[in-house]
Structure formats: structure tokens, C-alpha cells
């Protein structure tokens, strides 16, 4: 099927979509992956470095290193599933962060500036069309009938608290 044929192409596209220059004077960070990138903008090189264990946790640290101080905008993609997201630049809280939008940080950047992004990665029970799924950040937990480990339509009760939060426990 098309997923088997086209799925591997997505991995090759990661470097092209992780960072993007949508307009003059702006660079977007779309994916949160440990990485280092150099972007040419405004007649200089700007190095961006990401440190993260995402999606194991929701913390991302981005270091910005322009060759010289420069004014430009960094757009952080805020995932739609993150109900509570915090963004800081050099320890100062950024206001107006909204799920499903870009957080635009316009400032004069200097070498060593740090952006901290903390996403709300709690597991949540999602119920739609008489079906259930558990989402934990960008990961959707699903049951696959191909494993033949029971009847897929078998009813189950997934306990939640604080609305739709699910407690998950890792197994080894």
C-alpha cells in the first residue's frame, strides 16, 4: 500500500521540514529532535542546536548562535495536543503561547541565547465516534487486531482523573 512505499520518504524529508524559512527574517522550528542546523539568513549564518528527549518528556532546549547580534523572528510550532505549554527565552517567560499555533519570538538574538519549550505531555483518553484512544503527547497508543490478543470490540474501562488524564506505567 502507499504507506509502505511512501513512509520511508518521510524520514528523508525530516531535514527539510524541521527548520523552515517561511519569510524574510523568520525561521520556524517545526520538529523537536536532537539536532544542529546552520541557516543562512540576513547575510549571516545562524546556528541552531536542539537538546531534547522528546517525546519521552516534553522538554526542548534550543540554543541560538548567530555570527553576530541580529534581529529576526523564531517561530516555534506549538503542538495542538499540548494544553499547557511554556516558552522561555533566557529564563524569561514568553506570553501568548497557544496550542496549535506558532509562538513568534521577535527579538535581537545574540550567541548563546536559549529557548526553553515545555509541552504538556500527559496521557489523555480521547473518545470519538464510540471509539477510544490514548494520546501521550505526539504518540497515539493503539491496539492492533493483527496481534490476535483478544476481541477488538471487547468493552474496556480506562480510568481517568482531572477530566481525561490517564495514568500510564511503563513496563519492561
Summary of predicted features, one role per range:
Residues 69-89:
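Beta-strand-rich binding/interaction modules
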Residues 67, 79, 120-122:
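Histidine- and/or cysteine-centered catalytic micro-motif in compact active-site loops
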Residues 1-63, 98, 107, 118-172:
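C-terminal beta-rich recognition modules with glycine/proline-rich loops and embedded aromatic residues
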Residues 82-107, 125-129:
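Solvent-exposed beta-strand/loop surfaces of large extracellular or lumenal domains
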Residues 57-59, 71, 112:
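A general secondary-structure signal for short beta-strands and their flanking turns/coil
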Residues 68, 99, 110-111:
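Surface-exposed loops/turns
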Amino acid at each position: 500500500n502507499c504507506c509502505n512505499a511512501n513512509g520511508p520518504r518521510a524520514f528523508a524529508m525530516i531535514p527539510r521540514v524541521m527548520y523552515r524559512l517561511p519569510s524574510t527574517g523568520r525561521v520556524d522550528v517545526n520538529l523537536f529532535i536532537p539536532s544542529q542546523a546552520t541557516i543562512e539568513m540576513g547575510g549571516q549564518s545562524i546556528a541552531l542546536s536542539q537538546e531534547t528527549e522528546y517525546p519521552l518528556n516534553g522538554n526542548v532546549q534550543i540554543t541560538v548562535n548567530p555570527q553576530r547580534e541580529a534581529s529576526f523572528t523564531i517561530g516555534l510550532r506549538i503542538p495542538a495536543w499540548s494544553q499547557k505549554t511554556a516558552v522561555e527565552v533566557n529564563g524569561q517567560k514568553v506570553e501568548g503561547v497557544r496550542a496549535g499555533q506558532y509562538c513568534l519570538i521577535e527579538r535581537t538574538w545574540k550567541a548563546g541565547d536559549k529557548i526553553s519549550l515545555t509541552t504538556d505531555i500527559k496521557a489523555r483518553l480521547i473518545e470519538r465516534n464510540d471509539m477510544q484512544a490514548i494520546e501521550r503527547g505526539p504518540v497515539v497508543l493503539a491496539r492492533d487486531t493483527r496481534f490476535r490478543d483478544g476481541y477488538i470490540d471487547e468493552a474496556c474501562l480506562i480510568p481517568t482523573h482531572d477530566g481525561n488524564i490517564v495514568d500510564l506505567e511503563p513496563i519492561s
